[in-house]
């Protein structure tokens, strides 16, 4: 702890108190204390950052039964079903107490082991079981307002910006409303915007020309690999395999997301909830499916 952290906590509590009073709590400060108390316990369940960067420790494939067992008395099975994951047999979780073999393989000393024991997912599930319900209610109310502040009344948006924008990030003022509105649309239905953008500014003949150029570059690179003297046969084979697996993505995707099942109206908050619901269901639809290498992780615009 230091003076800076004390100041930040005070500012954070002030923001929470204001938001929770807006949400209907008579004593915003008392409700804010409940949120901070819960978040402190959640933080204690997190692993030490340095140890948590060890990939050998953070890839843990477990069965549904094993995950449920980690929760003890907490209804983990109901949580899994509530997330729409009831048909999944296996899960990959990042943080679970390492086995004796993993401790030895990764050379964890006693201090490091203490930082990853009893916490992680099992620790979080324990907090979910033991923390008072009124803490969870205040926590969820506050974070719903924080997470959706950009589509809520200006008083809420300004309160959130005052802490996250000014106090934490040192920003003097919010970006213009229209710019944030554009970001909201792009983050919600970005490929629909991208389709219009591509039609206007990157016609099909331009894409065809660039596709041909990239294909020629790939051919030239492949021929160059065959003649490189300093590269061994095994390394060449690996390089050629990597080149053959490369999927060029020029201009815009071959097929755009249509957002067929997304319904929006004139209510900004309701639209945000609809987008979140659509995005989550879309993510679930990919489970167990082959990787779609034509899908883009960026927007044309």
Q: How would you describe each model-predicted region?
A:
Residues 227, 250-257:
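Amphipathic alpha-helical coiled-coil segments
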